Curated annotation (Swiss-Prot):
TM region positions: none
Keyword Repressor belongs to the record: no
Protein name per the record: Hemoglobin subunit beta-C
One Gene Ontology term of the molecular function aspect: metal ion binding
Organism listed in the record: Catostomus clarkii
Amino acid sequence: VEWSDSERKTLVSVWGKI
């Protein structure tokens, strides 16, 4: 599964909150 740059940034933000 390939994620776009924007989607990856969103994931990083969510993971950072955890």
